[in-house]
């Protein structure tokens, strides 16, 4: 987000829960702070599904609200719990010119509940927002790569990966320290049992997943220059919890092959083999 003016900004607040509601109220938005207050659905067992349904208000909310004349955006944190911890995450202004961009900030779930309650009692409530965030120049950062050469098909590459960076307010243990450790364990365990893979096993710890995936983009660019042949890639980026299975991005024929591997995982209670998205860096 951009910063607020030096003295902050104070404005009336308009609360919406969906983009449909935002468009319905577009003529009421000018000069106001838009408060996106759509909670994640607690009835969904898969928290990533609940997250996916709610994340667009944080990702695109400021861009759309700015086009309707809003002066700022407050977004309910994407969190199933009621607590006082605001959550950081990616947001975008799309192709809005710098002069049209408005400040955006997350509010904790408890804060969102309180603000919504206060607005129900006083529609003319004014909200004061002050923040001094800014974009600094890029600095050079690095992917970390290691590999075990394949003994039969060294030019066929299998990637196991995770991302090194995390949001600055957290310690990154789940996102994605656990994935980094899991990725590094793969070659360590194979070497421990003296297993030599037929294809090249490459461990890639990507930098800059959280705000642009530039580590993955750079890896892809370099790989194309070298004309490398990747036959398989997997990323662990879902926290350090008990493994449940795999979301697979492939065509139907390859997915059928991968699904046949499920019998090897059943003794470990790993049962989820479904077509879906791959890791963000993959």
Put a short name on every predicted segment.
Residues 15, 33-37, 71-76, 104-106, ...:
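Structural recognition of the beta-strand scaffold that forms the well-ordered cores
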Residues 26, 45-49, 83-88, 157-158, ...:
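Short, solvent-exposed loop/turn and secondary-structure capping segments
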Residues 188-214:
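Short helix-loop-beta-strand segments that form the rim/entrance of peptidase-like active sites
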Residues 1-27, 93-173, 185-198, 221:
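Soluble metallo-hydrolase cores and metallopeptidase-like ectodomains found primarily
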Residues 66-71, 75-78, 116-120, 188-195, ...:
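Sec-exported extracytoplasmic/periplasmic mature domains
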Residues 52-60, 106, 110, 136, ...:
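Soluble non-cytosolic domains of exported or imported proteins
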Residues 6, 11, 102-104, 112-113, ...:
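Metal-dependent peptidase/peptidase-like ectodomains
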Residues 2-96, 101-103, 269-271:
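Extracellular/luminal Protease-associated
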